[in-house]
């Protein structure tokens, strides 16, 4: 589907010339272009016209949630028939894990997750992996922070169609592998599903509608989209794609391999600390990581599991974590709003995060892979 810009206004003044110059620059593969304009001069409208003409999936990057929300609202109005998504940090409150050597103070990670923002983040990644080209994602600098491997996200995506031969229990297991939870008591809760006889209701993690799958023996008889409030059927579907309920999804094979690699690196790091005369750090690291490994084996996750993302992603040492940018196709457009503020902020946030994690590694709280 192509971008369809909807507006009662037409480009005026310097806007037509700016739009033409930007579009020509993009088609000529100019890597960086800057659009200058005072507040209220219609820069967002100008960019919307460029997006419509270029027709590529677009990331609009802002330096805080408030501005990102404003841009999201504007682009949503400009492109009501296209996929406009919102991707910001889903924490209402976040205190990262840290260690202050000067006062010998260890600070535990503490956070509060906003489930509505998590739903919007999942909607953004799902739209990008759907194969659509008419996707705009408005994001804060949260887009550079680690999330799951898009390859694994795709692997546990479930595709169903009417008439498909599949045992109901096999389908339920695939939902669990996609991190949906069975809950027979909840009226409506994102990321859950319930079963009544041959009917399975799926409360999508990234959408407000319910998907109802009705089985006849070992065949899908019908797929329906249901309004979550009125429970009225909105439409009958011939096929549907169910995306995972969490961005941090992985496979059983990766978990098994990750545990092995964590234990190998733990042995090396403990040996290193002992060789340089740091028995306290060696003991601390061994106890913490061993506990985390046992948790991962038992329940599939642990507190601070993001520190082990390199093992679960199958990445080489020194490579960056997967982030929102990896969910975009190779050829996409990036628009940085107020770049004189946003670009330095990205550098500063990366620097601060690395400094914090370096302390945790040096004092035996985390493995070097956390960096």
Where are the predicted features?
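ASCE RecA-like P-loop NTPase motor cores
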Residues: 1-371
């Amino acid at each position: 589907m192509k971008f369809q810009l909807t507006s009662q206004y037409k480009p005026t003044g310097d806007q037509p010339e700016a739009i033409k110059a930007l579009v020509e620059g993009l088609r000529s593969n100019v890597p960086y272009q800057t659009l200058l304009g005072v507040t209220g001069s219609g820069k967002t409208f100008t960019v919307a016209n460029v997006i419509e003409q270029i027709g590529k999936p677009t990331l609009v990057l802002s330096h805080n949630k408030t501005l990102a929300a404003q841009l999201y609202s504007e682009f949503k109005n400009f492109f009501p028939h296209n996929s406009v998504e919102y991707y910001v940090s889903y924490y209402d409150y976040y205190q990262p894990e840290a260690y202050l050597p000067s006062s010998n103070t260890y600070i535990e990670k503490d956070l509060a997750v906003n489930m509505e923002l998590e739903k919007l983040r999942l909607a953004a990644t799902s739209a990008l992996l759907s194969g659509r080209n008419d996707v705009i994602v408005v994001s804060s600098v949260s887009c550079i922070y680690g999330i799951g491997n898009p390859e694994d996200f795709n692997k546990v995506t479930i595709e169903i169609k009417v008439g498909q031969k599949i045992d109901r229990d096999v389908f339920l297991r695939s939902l669990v592998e996609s991190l949906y939870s069975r809950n027979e008591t909840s009226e409506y809760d994102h990321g859950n599903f319930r079963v009544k006889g041959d009917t399975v209701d799926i409360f999508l993690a990234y959408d407000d509608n319910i998907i109802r799958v009705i089985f006849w023996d070992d065949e899908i008889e019908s797929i329906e989209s249901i309004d979550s409030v009125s429970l009225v059927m909105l439409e009958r579907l011939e096929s549907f794609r169910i995306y995972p309920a969490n961005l941090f999804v992985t496979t059983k094979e990766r978990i098994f391999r990750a545990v092995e690699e964590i234990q190998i690196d733990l042995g090396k790091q403990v040996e290193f600390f002992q060789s340089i005369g740091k028995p306290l750090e060696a003991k601390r690291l061994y106890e913490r990581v061993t506990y985390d490994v046992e948790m991962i084996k038992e329940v599939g996750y642990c507190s601070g599991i993001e520190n082990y993302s390199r093992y679960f992603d199958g990445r080489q040492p020194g490579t960056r974590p997967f982030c929102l940018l990896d969910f975009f196709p190779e050829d996409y457009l990036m628009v940085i709003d107020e770049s004189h503020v946003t670009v330095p902020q990205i550098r500063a946030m990366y620097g601060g995060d690395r400094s914090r994690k370096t302390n945790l590694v040096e004092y035996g709280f985390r493995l070097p892979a956390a960096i």
